[in-house]
Structures are given as C-alpha cells and as structure tokens.
UniProtKB/Swiss-Prot annotation:
UniProt-recorded name of the protein: Ribulose bisphosphate carboxylase large chain
Originating species: Nostoc punctiforme (strain ATCC 29133 / PCC 73102)
Miscellaneous comment: The basic functional RuBisCO is composed of a large chain homodimer in a 'head-to-tail' conformation. In form I RuBisCO this homodimer is arranged in a barrel-like tetramer with the small subunits forming a tetrameric 'cap' on each end of the 'barrel'.
HAMAP family, per the entry: RuBisCO_L_type1
Gene3D superfamilies the record matches: Ribulose bisphosphate carboxylase, large subunit, C-terminal domain (3.20.20.110), RuBisCO large subunit, N-terminal domain (3.30.70.150)
Active-site residues from the entry: 176 (proton acceptor), 295 (proton acceptor)
Signal peptide: none
Enzyme Commission designation: 4.1.1.39
C-alpha cells in the first residue's frame, strides 16, 4: 500500500482513510512499564520504507492496528491497548537492518497461554509487505505474566532428587537406527546402554507409532529393559518414551500407559505438536509425578535464518513457560548449529532465575523468572568421548550429555560404548573437582582414564580424528 496519507471526513466526524503507522505507533518518548511484554525484532524494511514507519507497522500489526483507520477505533482506548515501537537501533555491520523494540500492554494476552502470545506477536506481521524480512530476537516476559504459568513440571532440583544423582551431568543416548527396529530389539538396545552406565536412553523425535514398532509394544519392552538394568546396576534409570501423537487424547493415553509401567520420564516434540498440546502434557506430568523431556524438532526451520524467523532463545523461553524438564540446546562442539556465547545465553535463560541483559550473547532484555523452575539443557548431536572435557566445561552439571552415535558406534557394542562415556565423564568431573583446567588439560585427562578402561581406549582410537568444523550461522 502507499504510505501517503489519505483522509475522508465522514458525516459523523470520524476521519476515515489511510495514515502512516508512525503517527500512532512510533513513540520514542515512551518508557516501558514493568508490566509490559517487550519484544526485540530484527527488521529489514523494503526500499523506500523509513525504519520508523516499518517499526511502527510491526507494533501496529502485532497489536491493535490494521492497514486503514476503522470507525471502531472510537469504541476503545487505543492508548491503553496498542503496541508501541519505542526504540530503533541500526544493526552494526548490516545495511538496512534495525533492531526494533516494541512494548505490548499485558492486557493483550490471555493468562498462561504461550499460544496466544505467539499468535499475537508473530502470527500475522511476518508476512507484511512493507518488510523484506523480520526476525523475533528476544522477548521480555513480565513477572506479572510469568506468575500465570506453571512452567516446567518439576525442574532441575526435583529431577535430581527423584533420580538420586548429584554433582555431575547426566548421560544419555538416542537409540539408533531411529526407525526400523522391532520393539524387542529396541528394548535390547536400551538395556545394553543402561547397564553400561548411562542414566537415560531416548526415543528419537520421529519415533511415535509405526507398523514395524507400535508404541504400546515399545513401551513394554523398554520398561522391561529399564527394570533389568536398574536391578543389575543399583541405579535409577529412565528412557524418554515419546508420547507425541496425532491427537491430544492419544498423547495423554500414551502418557497414562507410561505411568502404569512406572516409567520416570516421557518425551514430547513440542514444536511439531504445538504449545497447546505441550502445556496440556506438562500439567499432566506435574500432577502425575513424571519428568518431561522436550525435543525441539523443526526448530531450525524457524530459527536458522539470521534475518527472518524466530530466534531459538524465544522458543526456549516459551518452552520454559509452557513446561518441560529437559530441552535440546545444541552442543557448541558437535554436528549441530550453535555458537558458544549465543548458545550459553539461552541455556542461562532456561536454567537461571535472573539473567541480566547482555547483547553480546543475544540477550536483549533482563529477564526475571520469578522462581519458575529451571529446565535442564540437553547437549546432543555428533559428540563423542573426546568432547567430554569441553562439554562439562561449557554446560556444567545441570545438563544431559547425550551420545547417540558416540555410544552405539563403539566397535564392541552398546554396553562398552556406554561404559566408555561414563568413565570419561567420571574422570573429567573428578579432574575438575581437583582443580584441573579442562580446557587446557582435557585431552590428557581422557588419555589417563583410557589407560585403565579398555572400552574408553577403543573409543578414543575410533573417534580421534572426528571433527565438525563449520562456521556457525547463529551469531550476534
């Protein structure tokens, strides 16, 4: 549409027509309130569109505005309900890119609904013709709004208490091949990994229910494997049983069956299933005492492009509100996308209670979580024993280090692969606790441990040359 102003005087005195968004929605003198929901957008206007007009258009189209003045504006108090573009900053090193800051009144959003927040803020405006590209970089959720959410079913401390495991990261493994195994062979793979020393095994994101492996059969054989491994090792074990299903009713049916089998943890694909389904499941998990592991399948479709989409830190914050005890975050050192500063920025947003603004890590707003439970970060994707020192140094104790191929690819089988990872982890944690520098001495620590663990020695030899050295796309 043209940005020239046009007006028509109606008989009632109402000024009809089209006017620039910035006349109403660009308010550089506005000071955000503690109760405002704040959003930072990376904005690329079309040629000829001033950044102030584009920023105001984002504020308008994601709150109360539309393309023309409407007479029903007179029936409400727009100053109370409209979004406001209150600041615009050019992006250093980029032509025609700006960070646009928008403040939204809290009354615009339904209590306890991530679905409603995202529908409002990103539901329509991303297709707006005045913008060449738009990316939601961050959201500041006000404390008043956070208090309307349950959040994670249990949180980090409750999980450790349930598992009776403290002072180290937890170890996991995704069963491979992800598709094609019968339920019985799948259960056998789970048992071998758990008896070898892992804390968890995991369904992959696309394991739901298929002709070669129906969900009920998988649950039964996995439960048998867990019971046997627990009896042999004396440790509490778990498997992330994926309850993602075609309908919410079927999802809850699968969750109930996992509960009947006395399983400690289930799993959900929160983006493909949707936030309404995820919040429903998270509340069920709290009521029934079951941990909830979250997979982020489909996230890169949304967050990979630097100038358009939604940054994963927003999806991570939304998950903490919706509910989940674990979520995949990337590894920094493995095969999946993730630059260290950016990754640890959203890992802190998942785990900590209060996070200060730090734009060097992509954190555009100070976030107070009002004591909402934290979410454990899951590092998964292309990692092996040589990565263990870096993973412990980067992610710390409140994490799950998940070795799929790094367990199942061991030449001697699943159990020795699991043992190699457990020995490496225990050696690295002991070295850290003794004051050794993991970044500088990590390889030496692994070599020393391999002298008395043949399983680890074989793993070290197999993966000594494996690296994933590509430039990260996700940078500030």
């Amino acid at each position: 549409m043209s940005y020239a102003q046009t007006k028509t005087q109606s008989k009632s005195g109402y000024q009809a027509g089209v006017k620039d968004y910035r006349l109403t929605y660009y308010t550089p003198d506005y000071t955000p309130k503690d109760t405002d929901l704040l959003a930072a957008f990376r904005m690329t206007p079309q040629p000829g569109v001033p950044p102030e007009e584009a920023g105001a258009a984002v504020a308008a189209e994601s709150s109360t505005g539309t393309w023309t003045t409407v007479w029903t504006d007179l029936l409400t108090d727009l100053d109370r309900y409209k979004g406001r573009c209150y600041d615009i900053e050019p992006v250093p090193g980029e032509d025609n890119q700006y960070i646009c800051y928008v403040a939204y009144p809290l009354d615009l959003f339904e209590e306890g609904s991530v679905t409603n927040v995202l529908t409002s803020i990103v539901g329509n405006v991303f297709g707006f013709k005045a913008l060449r590209a738009l990316r939601l970089e961050d959201i500041r959720f006000p404390v008043a709004y956070i208090k309307t959410f349950q959040g994670p079913p249990h949180g980090i401390q409750v999980e450790r208490d349930k598992l009776n495991k403290y002072g180290r990261p937890l170890l996991g493994c995704t069963i491979k091949p992800k598709l094609g195994l019968s339920a019985k062979n799948y259960g056998r793979a789970v048992y071998e990994c758990l008896r070898g020393g892992l804390d968890f095994t995991k369904d992959d994101e696309n394991i739901n229910s298929a002709p070669f492996q129906r969900w009920r059969d998988r649950f039964l054989f996995v439960a048998e494997a867990i019971n046997k491994a627990q009896a042999e090792t004396g440790e509490i074990k778990g498997h992330y049983l994926n309850v993602t299903a075609p309908t919410c009713e079927q999802m809850l049916q699968r969750a109930e069956y996992a509960k009947e089998l006395k399983q400690p943890i289930i799993m959900h694909d929160y983006l493909t299933a949707g936030f309404t389904a995820n919040t429903t499941l998270a509340r069920w998990c709290r009521d029934n005492g079951i941990l909830l592991h979250i997979h982020r399948a489909m996230h890169a479709v949304i967050d990979r492009q630097k100038n358009h989409g939604i940054h994963f830190r927003v999806l991570a914050k939304a998950l903490r509100l919706s509910g989940g005890d674990h979520i995949h975050t990337g590894t920094v050192v493995g095969k999946l996308e993730g630059e260290r500063g950016i990754t640890m920025g959203f890992v802190d947003l998942l785990r900590e209670n209060y996070i200060e603004q730090d734009k060097s890590r992509g954190i555009y707003f100070t976030q107070d979580w009002a004591s909402l439970p934290g979410v454990m970060a899951v590092a998964s994707g292309g990692i092996h024993v040589w990565h263990m020192p870096a993973l412990v140094e980067i992610f710390g104790d409140d994490s799950v280090l998940q070795f799929g191929g790094g367990t199942l690819g061991h030449p001697w089988g699943n159990a020795p692969g699991a043992t190699a990872n457990r020995v490496a982890l225990e050696a690295v944690v002991q070295a850290r606790n003794e004051g050794r520098n993991l970044a500088r001495e990590g390889n030496d620590i692994i070599r020393e441990a391999a002298k008395w663990s043949p399983e680890l020695a074989v793993a070290c030899e197999l993966w000594k040359e494996i690296k994933f050295e590509f430039e990260a796309m996700d940078t500030v």
